[in-house]
Amino acid sequence: GMSPNSFFDKVSQNFRDLLKKIDSTNSDFIRTTENRHETACKIFWNTLCDNNQVYLSKYEGWYSIKDESFYQEKELIKKNDSFFTADNEKVEWIEEESFFFKLSEWENSLLNYYEENPEFIQPKSRRNEVISFVRSGLKDLSISRTSFKWGIKVENNSNHIMYVWIDALVNYLTSLGYPDLKKKKKYWEECIHVIGKDILKFHAVYWPAMLMAANLSLPKKIFAHGWWTNEGQKISKSLGNVIDPYEIINEYGLDQIRFFLFREVPFGNDGDFSKKAIANRINADL
């Protein structure tokens, strides 16, 4: 076996190695296990508490282990006596004590912000999805867990671990020196989140609401890109059709692959990947 930290060390190094391979540079590389991030998360959490945005209660709901996400029953598909997500992932009913963020209080503020800042969420189709989701009604968000021990402990209640909504999203602030954002203020003011469409709700609903609740400004823009399929099929480990970036770069060249990925599909749309498509695009355009 391998400890969680050892496993994540290995995964982290894989990403660092890949960045070198694709000739990509970054000003910071942050991991949520770092001390600076734990400090930032605790300060952010305490700020929400000080602003009366967090309370302790009990959570009951449908939970997807794979997605690390809770679902409302109306979002699920019932098959026999079980419930499944749209991606056919089975969910489980979970009951546990949890801290909650008062997300429901920020429904109108979010809708007003979307209206006043029409370019905040891109592309437009994703913006419409988010607005529709918020208009359907927001429930308070569970932001802690007692069912696992890996993660950042809640101060004054060590039985609770901060959930991913806090732990993962706050890393954007950690990398800029939060709580002191003065030195890198311009970076936050011009910040653009480029994310997968599957995590748009977290970035365009939960995150802005928490930032508002913590009296912080919002990122300038959130751009949700689409998904790639592999010759018409969803890419997954179970299908064995995951594309090895090292293999494809070595076969066709880095610049060629980079050109294909940006040229083949309008940014924001879904696209289909195939070696035939790569060859056709390279031969036609380069």
Residue ranges and their predicted role:
Residues 5, 13, 27, 82, ...:
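Short non-domain terminal segments
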Residues 19-20, 81-82, 261:
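Short, flexible segments with low predicted structural confidence
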Residues 17-24, 46-56, 68-76, 119, ...:
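Alpha-helix capping at helix-to-loop junctions
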